[in-house]
Amino acid sequence: QRQMCIRDRQSALLEAMQERQVTIGNETFGLPKPFLVLATQNPIEQEGTYPLPEAQVDRFMLKVVIDYPKLEEEKLIIRQNINGDKFEVKPILKADEIIEARKVVRQVYLDEKIEKYIVDIVFATRYPEKYDLKELKDMIGFGGSPRASINLALAARSYAFIKRRGYVIPEDVRAVAPVSYTHLTLPTNRE
């Protein structure tokens, strides 16, 4: 029963992430734009935690690991929570501004040489021996999917946009690679 509920939830999340819609009963509803999914991931060893299927992991563009807060930050967290301080979140962008920014990011120039660089990085996770990385062959269960290449290219374009450039350079790709495709390269010992 519990496994069925988890599968149903995962299926619903996949539908939302891939098709930008949700289905309730026999009725389908389109999701508003912009639509994005932010998720947290607990260690798999924790009770009540289940590994995401590969198809679901593959749909996340980035995986950002956030470490514990620094000493002073944690003291501030304590003060804010025990004093009952209200956290005020103020919007900094409107939905239409996010949609417009996404359009501009997609116009950032990506040269064919940078495209090849991106594809080589992802292909090296699939065929490490062809890239003189034989020692990685037994460590990688599944190399990055085509979506890993797409995500790396989009992340590099976004980084160039943030750096106020209309074109991608290799440093942009290197800057975003650790967060944009490593979670899509599954180790052989994944449980």
What are these regions (language model features)?
Residues Q1-D8, T182-E191:
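Conserved small/polar residues in nucleotide/adenosyl-binding loops
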